[in-house]
C-alpha cells in the first residue's frame, strides 16, 4: 500500500545518486587525457583542500564536494592499473558505502572493486580506512590486487595478517588504507587496551570501516565475544564440595512436589528453590550462598548443571583422566577445548578426575560493540535485505540495493521434497548425472562435511569426476583453485556451507587464475625461502597459519596444482620464455630469497597493468600475457558452449536455518547476466523440517501414500519452509538482541575505563592526576568519619586521623588536636594541603634513587590497578548477569536491575582504583633507598 503511494524507498535512493554518476561520467574524458604523473598529482590537490577543514563537519562537506572528481580519478587509475573500469552501478555502490550504509550487490558485480572508491576518498583524510574481510587469504589478495590502485595514486596501503609482530602491525595500521580481518582488528584493539606504554599501541582511533560480507560478520558472528584470557588459581576443594552437595540435592519433577531445584532443558539452565538454598546453606554451614567474602552460589549452580545437563559419553567423554568435550553437531571430540565459567571444573569434580586451572577473562568485546566504535561504518554483501531490521536497529545501518549491471537470467526451480534422506541423495545424484551428460557445470551445496562425503560416494559409483570443497583451513588456497574451475564444461563441484566466497565461478573457467597458477608453479620453488626444517617436520608450527596445512614435503604439493586444471599445454616457445623469466628472477633476487608473501605480491602485480620499474615484474608480465592468451582461446570457446547449454546449475541439498545463506548459494548461478539455474532438494528428515513442522508434512505424505522416491513439489510446502526459516531467524535475532542489550551496559563501562587508561598512557606528567586521587581519598575519609548533622564533639576525629595515617604514613605528625576546631570543609582543605606536602616529600625520596622514577611509578601503579580491578570487575559483572535472571520472578525487569547494579559496581571499582593507587604510591619503596623508620 505504502509502496504504491510513495514508490519504493530503495528506487528513490538510487534515483538521487544518478545525477552524481552522470557528473562522474562527464569528467571521464578530461581525466583520460592526464598523464600518470598528473593523475597522481590529483591526490595532492584533494589533500590540500581537505587540510582547510577546521572540524569534522567541514571535512565531510569537502569530501562530498570532491566525491565526483575523486571517483573519476579512481575509475581511471583502476583502468590503467587493473584493466578494470567501474560500471555506473559500481559508482553507486561506492557512494552508498561512503554514506555509511550497506550496499547490497549481487555476486559477481565486483564488490571488491567498489570498495576502492570510498576507501580512496576517505583515505585522503589520513585518518585511516579499514577494509575488513573474513579471512587472511582474502585480506592479502585484496591488499595486493586492489591495493595497487591506491598505491598508484599515492596513498599508502597496509595489510594485517596473523603472526605479524607489533612493529609491523603499527606500521600497517598507520597507512591510509589497511586491509585486515575482523578477528585481527578486534584482538589488536583489546591488546592495545592492555598495553603498558604508548609505544606498544598499534592502532589509531577507529575512523572509517568497510566490511566485506558484512552480514556474516555483523550478524552471524555478532554473538561471538572476542576474549583474551589468563589462568587463575581457584580453590579446587570448593568444586569437590559443591559436587558432593549437588548429589544430595533433589530435582523437582512437578509443582505439587516441591524439591531443591528445577531444570530448564530448553534454556539449559537450573533454578534453585528456596528450599534448595536453605538445604545447601545448611549442608555447607554458611549463612548465605551469595556472601561476597565466601561465595558458593556459582559453584553449586555449576555442580547441579554438571549433574543434570551434562551426560557422560553424550556431551563429553573421560579419557586419560581428562574430561573431553564432544561436539554436538559433528560428534567429534574437541581436544583442548574447555567449557568456561568453571563449568568444566564442575564436571571434573563430578567425574572425580584431577581439576585443571580455570581461565579468567582479561579483556573482552563483542563484534557488535567493536564495530560501533567507528565514526563511520559501511559494508557490502550479496544478501542483507532479509536482515535489514536488525542492521538498522543495532548498528543504525541502512541497506540500499544497488541494481545489477546486466539483468539476471537465472531460473529458480521450485523445491522438491522427498520422504527420506537416502531418497533425496539418490535424486541429487541422478540430477547431477543428467546435467553432467548435457555438459553443464554443476555446483552442489551441502551443509556438512559428512553430507558432502555421502554425495561424493554416490557420484563415485556412477564414475562422475568431481571436486570436493570442505571448510577446512588447509583447503583455502586449493579452494580458489577449484572454484576457479567450477564453471568449466561438465565440471562437478561439491561445496560445504558455501565455503569459498571471494572467488567467482566464471563460465568456461577462469583463465586469469590459471595463468597465475602456471607462473606460481615454476617461480615459487625457485624463489621462496625454504621453511625451518624443524617446523616442517611436525607439519605444524608456524605452518598451521599457512593457507595449506601440509606436512614435510609441503612445498612440492604446494606449488604443484592438480594436473587437470590447465585447459591446454603451453607451446614450447611460451614454456621457454617462462623458464627464462624465472631464471632472470632468480638472478635478480637470489635463489630462494623471498618470503611467500613477497613472491605472491610480485605475481599479483605481474598479472595486472600497474606501472612498475622492477625488470623482473616486467618480464613476468610479458609471459603472463602470453600464457593468458593461450588459455583464453580455450576458455572463451568453452564459455560460449556452456552459455548455450544453460550456464551453471546450482543444486542445494538442504534449506539452511537462514534464508540469507540459501540466497548466497543461489547467487552463484547467473552472475553478470550469464544464464543459470538453481534447485533445492529436500527431505522430511532434514533438520529444518524435522524441528519446525515436519510431522504435519509427513502425515500428508503418508496419507497420500507417497512412494519413497517420488518427490512432491508444492507451493504450500515451500511456504511452510519459509515460515520455518523466519521462525528460526526471529529466534536468533532475539538472542542477539538480548546479548546486545546486556553487553551495551558493559560497553559503556568499557569505553569509560579504556578512555581513562588511554589518558594515563598518553599523559606525560600524571602527578596532578595522582594528587587529585589523593585529595578525593582524603575527602572520602572525612565523609566516612564525620557527620555534619551531628555536633562536633560527637565527630570521630581520632579514627579519622588514624585512617589518614594508614593511607599516608608520611602524615605521622598529624594529631586529632590539629583538627578539633575545624569545620568539615576546613578539614578537607587542611588534609589536601598536608597530602600535597607529603607527596612532594615522597617524590624527593623516590627521585633520589633515580631521577624521573616517580613519574614512571605513577604510570605503573595506575595502569596496574586499572587492569587488576577491571579484570575482577568483568568477573563480578558475569556473576551478576548469571544471577540477575532470577529477578524476573520478583516482577522486576532483569535488564534494568543489571544496569543499576552494574553501574554501582563500576563506581565502586573506580573508587577502589583511586584509593589503591594512592596507597601503593605512598608505600612504594624503591631499592637503594633507606627504609622509613
UniProtKB/Swiss-Prot annotation:
Protein EC? 7.4.2.8
Q: Which of UniProt's keywords are assigned here? A: ATP-binding, Cell inner membrane, Cell membrane, Cytoplasm, Membrane, Nucleotide-binding, Protein transport, Thylakoid, Translocase, Translocation, Transport
Q: Which InterPro entries match?
A: Helicase_ATP-bd, P-loop_NTPase, SecA, SecA_CS, SecA_DEAD, SecA_motor_DEAD, SecA_preprotein_X-link_dom, SecA_SF2_C
Q: Cite a GO CC annotation.
A: plasma membrane-derived thylakoid membrane
Q: Where does ATP bind?
A: 90, 108-112, 504
Any matching Pfam family:
SecA_SW
Q: Where in the cell is it found?
A: Cell inner membrane; Cellular thylakoid membrane; Cytoplasm
**Reactions it catalyzes:** ATP + H2O + cellular proteinSide 1 = ADP + phosphate + cellular proteinSide 2
- Segments for region (Disordered): 539-570
What the protein does comes down to: Part of the Sec protein translocase complex. Interacts with the SecYEG preprotein conducting channel. Has a central role in coupling the hydrolysis of ATP to the transfer of proteins into and across the cell membrane, serving as an ATP-driven molecular motor driving the stepwise translocation of polypeptide chains across the membrane. Probably participates in protein translocation into and across both the cytoplasmic and thylakoid membranes in cyanobacterial cells.
Annotated family: Belongs to the SecA family.
Q: What is this protein called?
A: Protein translocase subunit SecA
Q: Lineage of the source organism?
A: Bacteria, Bacillati, Cyanobacteriota, Cyanophyceae, Oscillatoriophycideae
Amino acid at each position: 500500500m505504502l509502496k504504491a503511494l510513495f514508490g519504493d524507498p530503495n528506487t528513490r535512493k538510487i534515483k538521487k545518486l544518478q545525477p552524481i554518476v552522470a557528473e562522474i561520467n562527464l569528467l571521464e574524458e578530461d581525466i583520460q587525457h592526464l598523464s600518470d604523473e598528473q593523475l597522481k598529482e590529483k591526490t595532492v590537490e584533494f589533500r590540500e583542500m581537505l587540510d582547510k577543514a577546521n572540524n569534522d563537519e567541514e571535512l565531510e562537506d569537502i569530501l562530498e564536494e570532491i566525491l565526483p572528481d575523486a571517483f573519476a580519478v579512481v575509475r581511471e587509475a583502476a583502468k590503467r592499473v587493473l584493466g578494470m573500469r567501474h560500471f555506473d552501478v559500481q559508482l553507486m555502490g561506492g557512494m552508498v558505502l561512503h554514506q555509511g550504509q550497506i550496499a547490497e550487490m549481487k555476486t559477481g558485480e565486483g564488490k571488491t572493486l567498489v570498495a576502492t572508491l570510498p576507501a580512496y576518498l576517505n583515505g585522503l583524510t589520513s585518518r585511516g580506512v579499514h577494509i575488513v574481510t573474513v579471512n587472511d587469504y582474502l585480506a592479502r589478495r585484496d591488499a595486493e590486487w586492489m591495493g595497487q590502485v591506491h598505491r598508484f595514486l599515492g596513498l599508502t596501503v597496509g595489510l594485517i595478517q596473523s603472526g605479524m609482530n607489533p612493529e609491523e602491525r603499527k606500521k600497517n595500521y598507520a597507512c591510509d588504507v589497511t586491509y585486515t580481518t575482523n578477528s585481527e582488528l578486534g584482538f589488536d584493539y583489546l591488546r592495545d587496551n592492555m598495553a603498558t606504554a604508548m609505544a606498544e599501541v598499534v592502532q589509531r582511533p577507529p575512523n572509517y570501516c568497510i566490511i566485506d560480507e558484512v552480514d556474516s560478520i555483523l550478524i552471524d558472528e555478532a554473538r561471538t565475544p572476542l576474549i583474551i584470557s589468563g589462568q587463575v588459581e581457584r580453590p579446587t576443594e570448593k568444586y569437590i564440595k559443591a559436587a558432593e552437595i549437588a548429589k544430595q540435592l533433589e530435582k523437582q519433577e512437578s509443582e505439587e512436589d516441591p524439591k531443591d531445584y528445577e531444570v530448564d532443558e530448553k534454556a539449559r539452565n537450573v533454578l534453585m528453590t528456596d528450599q534448595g538454598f536453605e538445604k545447601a546453606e545448611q549442608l555447607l554451614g554458611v549463612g548465605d550462598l551469595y556472601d561476597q567474602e565466601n561465595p558458593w552460589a556459582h559453584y553449586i549452580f555449576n555442580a547441579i548443571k554438571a549433574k543434570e545437563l551434562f551426560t557422560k559419553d553424550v556431551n563429553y567423554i573421560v579419557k586419560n583422566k581428562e574430561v573431553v568435550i564432544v561436539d554436538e553437531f559433528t560428534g567429534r571430540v574437541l581436544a583442548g577445548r574447555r567449557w568456561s565459567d568453571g563449568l568444566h571444573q564442575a564436571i571434573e569434580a563430578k567425574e572425580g578426575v584431577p581439576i585443571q586451572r580455570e581461565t579468567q577473562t582479561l579483556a573482552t568485546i563483542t563484534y557488535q560493540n567493536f564495530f560501533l566504535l567507528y565514526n563511520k561504518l559501511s559494508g557490502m554483501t550479496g544478501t542483507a535485505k532479509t536482515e535489514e531490521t536488525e542492521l538498522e536497529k543495532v548498528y543504525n545501518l541502512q541497506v540500499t540495493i544497488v541494481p545489477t549491471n546486466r539483468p539476471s537470467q537465472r531460473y529458480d526451480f521450485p523445491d522438491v521434497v522427498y520422504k527420506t534422506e537416502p531418497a533425496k541423495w539418490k535424486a541429487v545424484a541422478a540430477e547431477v548425472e543428467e546435467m553432467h551428460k548435457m555438459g553443464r557445470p554443476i555446483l552442489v551445496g551441502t551443509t556438512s562435511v559428512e553430507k558432502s562425503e555421502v554425495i561424493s560416494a554416490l557420484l563415485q559409483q556412477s564414475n562422475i569426476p568431481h571436486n570436493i570443497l570442505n571448510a577446512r583451513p588447509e583447503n583455502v588456497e586449493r579452494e580458489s583453485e577449484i572454484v576457479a574451475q567450477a564453471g568449466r564444461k561438465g565440471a562437478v563441484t561439491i561445496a560445504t556451507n558455501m565455503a569459498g566466497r571471494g572467488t567467482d565461478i566464471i563460465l568456461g573457467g577462469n583463465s586469469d587464475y590459471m595463468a597465475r597458477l602456471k607462473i606460481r608453479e615454476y617461480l615459487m620453488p625457485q624463489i621462496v625461502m625454504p621453511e625451518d626444517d624443524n617446523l616442517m617436520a611436525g607439519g605444524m608450527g608456524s605452518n598451521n597459519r599457512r593457507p595449506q596445512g601440509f606436512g614435510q614435503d609441503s612445498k612440492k604439493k604446494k606449488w604443484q596444482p592438480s594436473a587437470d586444471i590447465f585447459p591446454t599445454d603451453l607451446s614450447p616457445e611460451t614454456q621457454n620464455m617462462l623458464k627464462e623469466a624465472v631464471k632472470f628472477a632468480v638472478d635478480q633476487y637470489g635463489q630462494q630469497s623471498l618470503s611467500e608473501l613477497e613472491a605472491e605480491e610480485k605475481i599479483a602485480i605481474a598479472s595486472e597493468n600497474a606501472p612498475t620499474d622492477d625488470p623482473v615484474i616486467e618480464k613476468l608480465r610479458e609471459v603472463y600475457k602470453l600464457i593468458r592468451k593461450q588459455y583464453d582461446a580455450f576458455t572463451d570457446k568453452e564459455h560460449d558452449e556452456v552459455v548455450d547449454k544453460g550456464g551453471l546449475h546450482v543444486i542445494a541439498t538442504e534449506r539452511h536455518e537462514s534464508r540469507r545463506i540459501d540466497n548466497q548459494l543461489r547467487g552463484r548461478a547467473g552472475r553478470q547476466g550469464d544464464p543459470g539455474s538453481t534447485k533445492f532438494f529436500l527431505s522430511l528428515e532434514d533438520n529444518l523440517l524435522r524441528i519446525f513442522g515436519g510431522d504435519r508434512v509427513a502425515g500428508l505424505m503418508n496419507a497420500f501414500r507417497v512412494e519413497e522416491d517420488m518427490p512432491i513439489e508444492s507451493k504450500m510446502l515451500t511456504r511452510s519452509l519459509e515460515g520455518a526459516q523466519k521462525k528460526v531467524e526471529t529466534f536468533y535475532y532475539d538472542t542477539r538482541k538480548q546479548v546486545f542489550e546486556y553487553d551495551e551496559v558493559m560497553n559503556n563501562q568499557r569505553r569509560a575505563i579504556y578512555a581513562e587508561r588511554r589518558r594515563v598512557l598518553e599523559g606525560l606528567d600524571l602527578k596532578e592526576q595522582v594528587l587529585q586521587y589523593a585529595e578525593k581519598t582524603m575527602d572520602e575519609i572525612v565523609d566516612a568519619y564525620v557527620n555534619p548533622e551531628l555536633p562536633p564533639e560527637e565527630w570521630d576525629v581520632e579514627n579519622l586521623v588514624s585512617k589518614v595515617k594508614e593511607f599516608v604514613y608520611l602524615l605521622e605528625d598529624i594529631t586529632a588536636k590539629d583538627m578539633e576546631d575545624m569545620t568539615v570543609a576546613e578539614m578537607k582543605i587542611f588534609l589536601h594541603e598536608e597530602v600535597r606536602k607529603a607527596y612532594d616529600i615522597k617524590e624527593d625520596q623516590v627521585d633520589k634513587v633515580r631521577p624521573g622514577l616517580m613519574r614512571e611509578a605513577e604510570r605503573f601503579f595506575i595502569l596496574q590497578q586499572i587492569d587488576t580491578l577491571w579484570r575482577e570487575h568483568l568477573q563480578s559483572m558475569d556473576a551478576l548477569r548469571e544471577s540477575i535472571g532470577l529477578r524476573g520472578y520478583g516482577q522486576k525487569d532483569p535488564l534494568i536491575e543489571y544496569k543499576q547494579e552494574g553501574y554501582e559496581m563500576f563506581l565502586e571499582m573506580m573508587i577502589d582504583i583511586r584509593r589503591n593507587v594512592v596507597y601503593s604510591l605512598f608505600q612504594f619503596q624503591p631499592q637503594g633507598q633507606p627504609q622509613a623508620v
